Regions:
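Sec/Tat signal peptide C-region and signal peptidase I cleavage site
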Residues: 14-18
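Generic alpha-helical secondary structure signal
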Residues: 24, 28, 46, 50, ...
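Short, surface-exposed glycine/acidic/tryptophan-bearing loops
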Residues: 49-99, 111
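Bacterial N-terminal signal peptides
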Residues: 2-11
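Surface-exposed patches in mature extracellular/periplasmic domains of secreted proteins
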Residues: 36-50, 63-74, 108-123
Length: 145
């Protein structure tokens, strides 16, 4: 069973644990999916990953899942010229999160956009009760091409 939340929440979640391994695992899943669809692999953008992590922290503090309202500002210093996009959500595993993105048409279209070149990834595990669930992963993925 795959569990994920890609919508708004209501409760409070004060504590989050970061894991540097989350970013590389998400990147591997995204690139494996893109490879399976004959698309080029994305490269990690460290500054964009910092922005993604900042947005994830903001969502956790607000205990709500939402796209960044300032995506244009976030991307203003990046070399993007064709597309800028975001995917946000939470799930009990990284696989469940990726699975949910791939089965939701808007997020799937983003992940499989052939014009994308770079990705920023911010994932945190929240160890307290919250809208998504105790020990669930909250994530922001930012893209440009």
């Amino acid at each position: 069973m795959v569990s994920a939340i890609l919508a708004l929440g209501i409760a409070f979640a004060p504590v989050a644990l970061a894991g540097s391994g989350f970013r590389s695992k998400v990147l591997r899943m995204v690139n494996a999916t893109r490879n399976n669809h004959d698309l080029h692999m994305l490269r990690i953008d460290r500054s964009l990953s910092r922005d993604a992590l900042r947005h994830t922290r903001r969502m956790i503090a607000d205990n709500a899942i939402y796209d960044p309202t300032n995506l244009t500002r976030i991307l203003q210093d990046e070399p993007w010229d064709q597309v800028g996009a975001s995917a946000v959500g939470c799930a009990d595993t990284l696989y469940a999160l990726h699975h949910a993105f791939m089965h939701e048409p808007v997020h799937r279209d983003i992940l499989l956009n052939p014009k994308l070149r770079r990705i920023g990834i911010g994932v945190l595990e929240v160890d307290s009760q919250n809208t998504c669930g105790r020990n669930w992963l909250w994530a922001t993925e930012l893209f440009y091409g």
